[in-house]
Amino acid sequence: VKVILAGAGAFGRKHLDAIRQIGGIEVLSVVGREPEATRSVAASYGIPHSTTQLGEALARPGVEAAILCTPTQLHAAQALECLRAGKHVQVEIPLADSWTDAEAVAALQKETGLVCMVGH
């Protein structure tokens, strides 16, 4: 499975550490807020691309899924962006910071048939 990971902070690094232990997963890009810090995380995990733009990472060739380890207030909007881009998505808890936003994500997931899961 070829994935991108959004969130180059502590939770993102925990996910990257876990991914190292699982066969068959290739991280194609890391997305973060600070370019230098994001480049550093990508380099330390051998990830070939880093960016500050989720859309740029989602558009990379071969990307099948996204892992979102970003601040809560970004979860719903980013999950919707991933689904609209045709990618499966795993979101750190909570899925959204409002019921309305959570319902919007659930509705788009049903419409697309893609996997949208909340991990903890």
List the predicted regions and their residue ranges.
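Short, well-ordered coil/turn segments that N-cap beta-strands
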Residues: 25, 64, 87, 113-115
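Rossmann-fold dehydrogenase core element
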Residues: 104-120
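N-terminal Rossmann-like dinucleotide-binding module
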Residues: 1-45
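Residues at the C-terminal ends
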Residues: 21, 84-86, 111
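Conserved residues at beta->alpha junctions
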Residues: 32, 69-70, 118
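Beta-loop-alpha module in the N-terminal Rossmann-like domain of NAD(P)-dependent dehydrogenases
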Residues: 45-106
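Short hydrophobic "strand-cap" motifs at the C-terminus of beta-strands
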Residues: 6, 92, 119
